[in-house]
Every structure is written in C-alpha cells, then in structure tokens.
From Swiss-Prot:
Its EC number is 6.3.5.2. Homodimer. The gene is guaA. PROSITE patterns: GATASE_TYPE_1 (PS51273), GMPS_ATP_PPASE (PS51553). One of its GO terms (cellular component) is cytosol. Keywords: ATP-binding, Glutamine amidotransferase, GMP biosynthesis, Ligase, Nucleotide-binding, Purine biosynthesis. It comes from the Bacteria. Pathway: Purine metabolism; GMP biosynthesis; GMP from XMP (L-Gln route): step 1/1. Residues 203-395 form the GMPS ATP-PPase domain. Residues 4-202 form the Glutamine amidotransferase type-1 domain. Catalyzes the synthesis of GMP from XMP. This is GMP synthase [glutamine-hydrolyzing].
Length: 520
C-alpha cells in the first residue's frame, strides 16, 4: 500500500504540476476537487495534504474552502497561493485584496527557522539573509497570521509570503513551488513530502504498470476495446498497455485522415500489426476528412470536425465489433488542462482538444483514458516499462488533429502534401545533427500565403513554411530552441530545393507563454 499525498484542487492552471512534482519525488498522490467529503478524506488516509492555488478571493461570498477535516486530521498541510489564503482565513487569520498584485518573478526573504525552508535559498545577502527567486501569481494577500503561526517568508509587496505553524505542521506559501520558475520549488516540495510528511519513495513506474493493468482489467472485464492508433507516443503507449492488460480484446483502428506525417501509415502497420501482434484495422478516410474540412478555416471548427469524424469512423468500426463497449484514447494531463480542468471545471478554457471536447452524447462506447492522469514524461517512462522501443517512446508529440492544425486556415490536400514533405526534411536534419533529442517538440507549419522568390533565372511565387522547435520540461511553459544557423540554413535549402511549391522558410522564435506551442 502506497503512502499517499492528497492534493485538493481549487482551480489553478498549475494544480496538475503539483502532482507531477510529488510523483517525481517518488511519492504517490491523487488530485481531487476541494469540496470532497470528510469521509472521503479520512478513507483516503493521506500522509499529508496540499491545497492548490486558484482564481477566487477568499473574502468573497461562496468561495471554495478546504474541508474542516483537513485541519483536524493531524497530518501536515501545505497551502499554495489560494491554498495558503484559505488556510489563513479558515484558521482565524485575515486576507485582503493586495494594493500591488504580483504576477511573475519575485524575490523573497526566506526565514530559515522553519523546517520547510531551513537551508533552502538561492543566495545570501550581505546581511546574511537567505533569498529565494520565486514565481508569484496573486491579487490577494494574507494580512494577519492565524494563532500559532509565525512568519516564514516575506518581501516588500507581500509582507506575509509564507507562514508556518510547526506544532501542527501547517505551512503556507504565497508563491508557486510547483513551477520551474521557482528555482528551489522542487527542493521545497521534496522537503514537505519526505521530511515533514514522512513519505518514502515507494511509487515508481513498474509499480504503476501493474496498478494500471489491474485497473483496466477491472474496468473492462470481458468487453472488447477499440483504440484509435496514430503512431504517436500517447496512442502507442495506450496500445501497449491495453494489449498487456486485455490481449485480443483490444482492436486498434488506424485512421488515415490524410493529415498524417510522411509514411506514417506504413510505419504504424509494420510496428504494431507485424512486430507486436496487435490487431489493427486500417481505415483510409482521407476523402471523408478532406470533404468535411473543405472551406473551413477557423482552428476550433477544424478541431471539432476532425474530432467528430474520428468518432463517426470509430462508431462505424464498432458496429463491426459487437462486443466492443469501450473507446480508448491517449488523453494525458496537458490535454485536460488546456481544455479546462476535467476534475473541477474551474480552470479557464484555452483551446479545445479533440480527445476531450468532441464526443457527442450519442456515442455508444464508454470512454477509457488510462493515461489521463499522466504527464508526457511519465507516459514515456510507462512506454519504456512496457517494453516499447526507445525511438518510438521518445518521438516528439503530434497533435490529434494532425496536420489539420499545422496548416493555417483552409485545409487542402495540396497543402498537406507540401507540408508533410517539408516536415520530414526538418525532422531528418534534426536527427542527423543530434538536435532532435535536444528539443522537446519540432515541426513545420504551412502558411497559406505566397511570396516572391528567384530560382535560377526565373521568378517564383510560392508558399511559405515556418519551422518551430521548442524546449520544455513539462509543456506548460516552453522556450524556443536556439538551433544553429548552419542547421537552419541547411533545412531551408533542402526544403526549397526538394519541395516544389515552397520558396521561403522562416523560424518561429516565440515562447509559451505568450504563444502556444502549436500555431492553431
């Protein structure tokens, strides 16, 4: 039985990152809504509890609160941002709107006399004060400590940036230790779960494999399952997991929608059908998708159409499998976050995802999402634990709608053909130069505009493509990859010379935020 941390979600976009950091520490955790019952908390029997951030103000009517049992159970509690504020308010302190809001980097003085922050600092001032570089995102602040608490961290804008009641092992921080911008954040969370909560490092991927297999078997029983197999990391890992769990009860449906990477269909069929022995049905639906997408330029509309047609194809294939009761998908945490929190519905929608936003009520299959609680790096670990090839598991992410969201505006077969050839050249050169492993995601975007060029003695008027490569630890934030000019030049020359119809190549130097990784 795992030692467990309970994370209560108050609606922050960062909440799932808390879970990721705790798991990285080798500690099992679960994320649940903030309004769970007292009986649930007691039955969960956590070693410690973390209260997440959130968009509300604790002094307003009807704002969320932590269940009272959180503070009477006798286990350590860490409140983050709003979690600290509701802790303060519920235990007798005061919270007010801040005259000066803090969003972004901040420097705070860490008072090292508490167990949580002792000897954790980024630097020491001439006066001997330990300082931390942290990430703030708040418009309210604690103005009076509850009884039994002492000051743990502060700066000019936020005099109470951290608080601690060491007798009860209650801690609150106004900053976000779960994001990478807080340089010592991982150290702080490790200190909480290991030293303060007393958890060991007993959660690991091999154990998770057995738990996931058991859960799938329990849920599915003797029913048959169909899975949309694209060849991407997520669907490949789902296929391997389900094949291990239910064997021939799994049928994979590979849908060629005309928006896949170069030679994708051949590679998928060879890897899974021939090498792994998985049952795979190959459906060529290119004409169908192109017909439905004709004339549509709005990105959200394209995503919805592609998602809808996938569902229709699966329904048609399911009718040929009378025992099929389940539709499996490779939905992972970042998909859910960007579509809005699936657990609480409190995070703001950024963009819809075809895995979580396009399933109609008339779908006759139940949804099975075994990767729903995992981040991308955890999915890759799971794939390795399941015995999948390294190159397959560490392939860059590919969006569910495929090239449909990498062709800006209207989707045409001509555009898709040009894009997949240009993209193949980019990826080939990244691999040859050793940069593929140094980037987290790289791809080419087709711009439906033409520019003037010169080739030989003639004038050209052809299309433009943009190269995009980013580096990230969690896909929540990302930096553009500083690829060598010589590499970019070689890719550009090859694309322009080898892909007739493209005469200009540009490179995207936008980070996330403010841009998203994909263009649409």
């Amino acid at each position: 039985m795992h030692q467990k941390i309970l994370i209560l979600d108050f609606g922050s976009q960062y909440t799932q990152l808390i879970a990721r950091r705790v798991r990285e520490a080798g500690v099992y955790c679960e994320l649940h809504p903030n309004d769970v019952s007292e009986d649930f908390v007691r039955e969960f029997a956590p070693q410690g509890i973390i209260l997440s951030g959130g968009p509300n103000s604790v002094y307003e009517d009807e704002t969320p609160r932590a269940p009272d049992v959180v503070f009477t159970l006798g286990v350590p509690v860490l409140g983050i941002c709003y979690g600290m504020q509701t802790m303060a308010a519920q235990l007798g302190g005061a919270v007010e709107s801040a005259a000066k809001r803090e969003f972004g980097y901040a420097e705070i003085r860490a008072r090292g006399h508490t167990q949580l922050l002792r000897d954790i600092q980024d630097r020491v001032t001439g006066e001997g004060h330990g300082m931390l570089d942290v990430w703030m995102s708040h418009g309210d602040k604690v103005t009076a400590l509850p009884e039994g608490f002492k000051l743990m961290a502060s700066n000019a804008a936020t005099p109470i940036a951290g608080m601690a009641d060491e007798a009860r092992r209650f801690y609150g921080v106004q900053f976000h230790p779960e994001v990478t911008h807080t340089l010592q954040g991982k150290h702080i969370l490790n200190r909480f779960v290991h030293d303060i909560c007393g958890c060991g490092s007993d959660w690991n991927m091999p154990d998770y494999v057995e738990e996931a297999i058991g859960k799938v078997r329990s849920e599915v029983g003797s029913d048959e399952v169909i899975l949309g197999l694209s060849g991407g990391v997520d669907s490949s890992v789902v296929a391997a997991l389900l094949h291990r769990a239910v064997g021939d009860q799994l049928t994979c449906v590979f849908v060629d929608n005309g928006l896949l990477r170069l030679n994708e269909a051949e590679q998928v069929m060879e890897t899974f059908a021939q090498n792994l022995g998985v049952k795979v049905i190959h459906v060529d639906a290119t004409e169908r998708f192109m017909r439905e997408l004709a004339g549509v330029s709005d990105p959200e509309q394209k995503r919805k159409i592609i998602g809808r047609e996938f569902v229709h194809v699966f329904q048609e294939e399911a009718e040929k499998l009378p025992k099929a009761k389940w539709l499996a998908q490779g939905t992972i945490y970042p998909d859910v976050i960007e579509s809005a929190s699936a657990k609480t519905k409190k995070a703001h929608t950024i963009k819809s995802h075809h895995n979580v936003g396009g399933l109609p009520e008339t779908l006759h299959l139940q949804l099975l999402e075994p990767l729903r609680e995992l981040f991308k790096d955890e999915v890759r670990e799971l794939g390795i634990a399941l015995g999948l090839p390294h190159d397959m598991v560490y392939r860059h992410p590919f969006p569910g709608p495929g090239l449909g969201v990498r062709i800006l505006g209207k989707v045409k077969r001509e555009y898709a053909d040009l894009l997949r050839r240009a993209d193949a050249i980019f990826i080939e050169e990244l691999r040859a130069s050793g940069w593929y492993e140094k980037t987290s995601q790289a791809f080419t975007v087709f711009l439906p505009v033409k520019s003037v060029g010169v080739m030989g003695d003639g004038r050209t008027y052809d299309y433009v493509v943009a190269l995009r490569a980013v580096q990230t630890q969690d896909f929540m934030t990302a930096h553009w990859a500083e690829l060598p000019y010589t590499l970019l030049g070689k890719v550009s020359n090859r694309i322009i010379n080898e892909v007739r119809g493209i005469n200009r190549v540009v490179y995207d130097v936008s980070g996330k935020p403010p841009a998203t990784i994909e263009w649409e």
